UniProtKB/Swiss-Prot annotation:
The protein's name: Anthranilate phosphoribosyltransferase
Cofactor section: Mg(2+)
Gene symbol of the encoding locus: trpD
GO cellular component, one term: cytosol
Keywords, alphabetical: Amino-acid biosynthesis, Aromatic amino acid biosynthesis, Glycosyltransferase, Magnesium, Metal-binding, Transferase, Tryptophan biosynthesis
Protein's pathway: Amino-acid biosynthesis; L-tryptophan biosynthesis; L-tryptophan from chorismate: step 2/5
């Protein structure tokens, strides 16, 4: 029986089977029709954490790796594909966490649903998003922040992109993006935002199986794949390779003000970059909704990076960094070093 037939019948794949299937997909061994059928069948069946881990194994076998010499390393990423067009808080949060002393390996791509994805805004800010692995390694080691542009570090994905574009639906690859950081072997902490509440436990289980030391999988209940100041947030905790807790966190619970969705709306890359400089450089007050949402996500990064022992302490440290303009200094160094 073919893998496609098994998936259609509702059978789950084990880790090795999922790895082998992904290697065949990204290795160009299957036709576009076969790949499309498998992607649609998987989505209809639903994924398991074990399947996700196997798919990660397969993708990483074909990835270009980055191996920075740091003791701890964090990634802040979302799946994209959320329901609201918010500004890119996770990217600014990564720069803020780096300014607070936690190295960040940011893995991202261009926009999925908003006007401005992580690659779009960093490019508009002057970062060379096409930097090679050695340059990214230096950025992480010397500045504390490096960006890995997904198409450059996962070149085999070119075999899948035409099918994904033609399908025009979310597939397992939307979920795999945050789990396939090219520096994965060095990543000790991760904040992953998901586009659906149904993905929380699934992704947390995969993150635990992949052995992350500390992780948070988050979903803003108004449909945001980041920690949001506009609503309650569902948060699943991963600690030492185990899913340990699940909680609902409102902005007010961690000392932040609730905002209206329009106050954290996204914009085109040029406008977003201009605003990002103000946020990172301390030009906006600490009670500004976008400053607070950046601090919310940066606080989570500091928590998973083991720089603080609570989300609240991480948020306060992030607010201090932003008020002092130190995150903008990190950005400027990354721009210089990546060019």
């Amino acid at each position: 029986m073919s893998v496609l037939e098994r998936i259609i019948r509702g059978s789950d794949l084990d880790r090795e089977e999922a790895r082998d299937l992904m290697c065949r997909i990204v290795g160009g061994e299957l036709s576009d029709v076969e790949v499309a059928g498998i992607l649609v069948a998987l989505r209809c069946k639903g994924y398991t954490s074990e399947e996700l881990v196997g798919f990660v194994d397969g993708m990483m076998e074909h990835a270009v790796k980055v191996d920075p010499d740091v003791e701890r390393l964090v990634d802040t990423a979302g799946t994209g594909g959320d329901e609201l067009d918010t500004f890119n808080a996770s990217t600014l949060a990564g720069l803020t966490a780096a300014a607070a002393g936690v190295p960040v390996a940011k893995h991202g791509n261009r926009s999925v649903t908003s006007e401005c994805g992580s690659a779009d805004i960093l490019e508009a800010l002057g970062v060379n998003i096409e930097a090679d692995p050695d340059t990214v390694k230096r950025c992480i080691e010397e500045v504390g922040f490096g960006f890995m542009f997904a198409p450059k570090f996962h070149p085999a994905m070119k075999n899948v992109m035409p099918v994904r574009r033609k399908l025009g639906i979310r597939t397992v690859f939307n979920v795999l993006g945050p789990l396939t950081n090219p520096a994965r072997e060095r990543v000790t902490g991760q904040v992953i935002g998901v586009y659906s509440e149904n993905l929380l436990d699934l992704v947390a289980g995969a993150l635990a199986e992949l052995g992350v030391r500390r992780g948070l999988v988050v979903y803003g209940l108004d449909g945001v794949d980041e920690l949001s100041v506009t609503c309650e947030n569902e948060v699943v905790y991963v600690d030492d390779g185990e899913v340990t807790d699940r909680d609902t966190v409102a902005p007010e619970d961690v000392g932040l003000d609730r905002a209206d969705p329009k106050d954290v709306a996204g914009a085109d890359p040029e406008t977003s970059a201009e605003e990002a400089r103000k946020i990172l450089g301390g030009e906006l007050p600490v009670d500004h909704p976008k400053v607070q949402m950046t601090a919310f996500n940066a606080g989570a990064a500091l928590y998973v990076g083991e720089a603080v022992d609570s989300l609240e302490k991480g948020i306060q440290r992030a607010l201090d960094v932003l008020e002092e303009g130190r995150a903008l200094e990190v950005l400027e160094k990354v721009v210089d070093l990546s060019s």
